[in-house]
């Protein structure tokens, strides 16, 4: 049995992976939390960069968390997450033979994808995965989304 839980913590970090931001936007669009026309999509993704400012990421999370149907994001993310949306690490995680190897790899390299946070794996009566986020904006929604990303 794997138990997923989180603890709150704060750390200063300035950028996040563009691929994670893109995956989040796609899930939000699929959940009908955000609607984009073709021109907006082109602006968002036409000039893709490797990293996105944490300020931009925080603004997106605030917008999503304030939506009356914010809970729909977690389900949409689980349904539509594709390893390709998480860049090279996503491909590496998808190629792992089991969840144990994936978590081990993720513990080492997850900061390259998202907005930080620490993953800790411990074993008592079962396995326990602790995710300690390094941010304050929309914590609950972000933690749920990250944990869905890990187990999806």
Residue ranges and their predicted role:
Residues 1-128, 142, 149:
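N-terminal low-complexity or simple alpha-helical regulatory segments
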Residues 130-141:
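A short interface-forming secondary-structure element
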Residues 152:
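Oxidoreductase and adenylate-handling cofactor-binding alpha/beta cores
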């Amino acid at each position: 049995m794997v138990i997923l839980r989180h603890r709150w913590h704060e750390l200063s970090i300035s950028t996040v992976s563009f691929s994670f931001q893109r995956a989040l936007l796609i899930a939000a669009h699929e959940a009908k939390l955000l609607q984009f026309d073709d021109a907006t999509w082109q602006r968002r993704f036409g000039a893709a960069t490797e990293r996105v400012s944490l300020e931009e990421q925080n603004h997106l999370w605030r917008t999503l968390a304030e939506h009356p149907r914010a809970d729909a994001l977690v389900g949409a993310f689980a349904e539509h997450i594709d390893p390709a949306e998480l860049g090279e690490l996503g491909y590496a995680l998808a190629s792992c033979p089991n969840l144990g190897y994936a978590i081990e790899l993720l513990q080492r390299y997850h900061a390259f994808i998202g907005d930080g946070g620490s993953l800790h794996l411990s074993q008592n009566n079962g396995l326990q995965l602790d995710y300690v986020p390094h941010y304050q904006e929309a914590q609950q929604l972000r933690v749920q989304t990250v944990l869905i990303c890990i187990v999806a």
